[in-house]
Amino acid sequence: MDNMVKTKKQGLLIVISGPSGCGKNSIINELLKIRNNIWVSISCTSREPRGEEKNGINYYFLSKEEFERDIKNDEFLEYAEYSGNYYGTPKKYIKEHLDNGEDVILEIEIQGALKIKEKLDETVFIFIMPPTMNELKRRLINRKTDSLEKIEKRFKRAYEEINEIPKYNYVVVNDDLDKAVKKVDAILEAERCRVDRIEEVYLDSKEERIHEALLDDVKDFDNSKIEIK
């Protein structure tokens, strides 16, 4: 008998957001080690690279003029301005990977996430939380990539972002990286089992087909030799 349930080939579109310093990238990097069907979309930004960030790996770094040109040409699935810089998700490649059955992760700011929610309601939205605000501030300071003024702006912005949690499907507190990764992995597994993501169920088929398939199973069972000791 064929499988009772056939899942869609289409991959999941997953949006992961959270305050700067909550550990989004660390969770995604660990997730890539345990799942081989994930593609992480590379965002575009008009900000300058930080530390050892590389173009085409961490971000596509564009000038403000280049970014605004791409906005006019409708090149982005979403875009937003954050701390004086543009961030956006290029449309290119995302559909291709989804159609190939790969799950696509977008690590984007909340403004952009909410724009995607308006357009694509099947998207899975996950919000990553720091264990405490004091811990978040400590992480931002220890990164040593921003001035104290920028850190204060990020910290204040974090409070605003946390107020948007009810608009997400899931929230994961990153107080332990391994546990946080397992929770996100479990979310993706559960999403694949949702009824509305199933392509075909026998209950949607003709009654005769169900009956014939069940008879085939019974016939195979009767013809099998089972020795009980």
Language-model features, listed with the residues they occupy:
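Post-Walker A alpha-helix
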Residues: 27-28
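Post-Walker A helix-loop "phosphate-sensing" segment adjacent to the P-loop in P-loop NTPases
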Residues: 32-41
